[in-house]
Amino acid sequence: MDKTKALDAALTQIERAFGKGSIMRLGKSGAALEVETISTGSLGLDIALGIGGLPRGRVVEIFGPESSGKTTLALHTVAEAQKKGGVCAFIDAEHALDPLYARKLGVNLDDLLISQPDAGEQALEIADTLVRSGAIDVLVVDSVAALVPRAELEGEMGDSQPGMQARLMSQALRKLTASISRSNCMVIFINQIRMKIGVMYGSPETTTGGNALKFYASVRLDIRRIGAIKERDEVVGNQTRVKVVKNKLAPPFKQVEFDIMYGEGISKAGELIDLGVKAGVVDKSGSWFSHDSQRIGQGRENVKGFLKGHPDVAGRIEAAIRQNAGLIAERILGSSEDSEDGEDAAEA
């Protein structure tokens, strides 16, 4: 009996036992080989991810220190999904979502499903039910650290419950992964940072909830606040750096910087200036900026104001940047060469 007949017999047996479509040849499956994506709301980050945004049907982890922009980035992704007609859900385990801020970022609150569960099991059960429905495009869990196991809630303050949250996350992700892929729903887990005690070499930082999420996530984003943006003496925003520490769909370790303005979110105009200058679309001479031989302003903040008031110019600059996305990724968003790369690679 030759191999072809043996294989056909095995395939027939598998389909009889588990149903048609349980096994197929990848090229003939009819499934799109290109992964569908949803924009992050940041042009630079979309380019750095290598596929034009965050992937659908996958697990994504966004982690970083406090007040670094984790929830802001997740809400921008929700807003972008809603613009395309997607249905989004937000599981607010921290009980800290600000609806007014979400609206300012472009989130349609009337269509956003929100849950504020009491226990971690309840939160993940709700997530599982929503994903299995097949009707959700983006599901955000904010945050993993706030998913408290019921046994810990019912216990006394100060009781030691080692590893319970890690076991909860591990079991939940085992159940969720297949459903997420089938329903083509993107699940974004927001996570916090903790310090490991007694680490002599490498980074002492780690994320909460054990190691399961590091393995199951297709994309992991490390977001950090690297400076303040001031107008005279008043702080009006943060300079933010995002590093792609894990990416199963494109080369990882790209990093990008952008501005997060208070009450506004990611500054698109600021990104257009920075990416435009580095890509050669916007010319900078001293403090003057010009595009297509036309001066558009003196000083970065003035140019941001000009682009907000002239969406046609901003649109042309964005189109030119997107057209050269491949070159830009190589030229300006090169792999970072920080000493922690080895640590990140090991954790990823």
From Swiss-Prot:
Pfam families on file: RecA (PF00154), RecA_C (PF21096)
Cellular compartment(s): Cytoplasm
Record keywords, A-Z: ATP-binding, Cytoplasm, DNA damage, DNA recombination, DNA repair, DNA-binding, Nucleotide-binding, SOS response
PROSITE patterns, alphabetized: RECA_1, RECA_2, RECA_3
Gene Ontology cellular component list: cytosol
Chain sites annotated for binding ATP: G64, P65, E66, S67, S68, G69, K70, T71
One Gene Ontology term from the biological process aspect of the record: SOS response
Recorded superkingdom: Bacteria
One of the record's GO molecular function terms: single-stranded DNA binding
Main localisation: cytoplasm
Role summary: Can catalyze the hydrolysis of ATP in the presence of single-stranded DNA, the ATP-dependent uptake of single-stranded DNA by duplex DNA, and the ATP-dependent hybridization of homologous single-stranded DNAs. It interacts with LexA causing its activation and leading to its autocatalytic cleavage.
Similarity-based family: Belongs to the RecA family.
Protein name: Protein RecA
Organism: Blastochloris viridis
Phylogenetic lineage: Bacteria, Pseudomonadati, Pseudomonadota, Alphaproteobacteria, Hyphomicrobiales
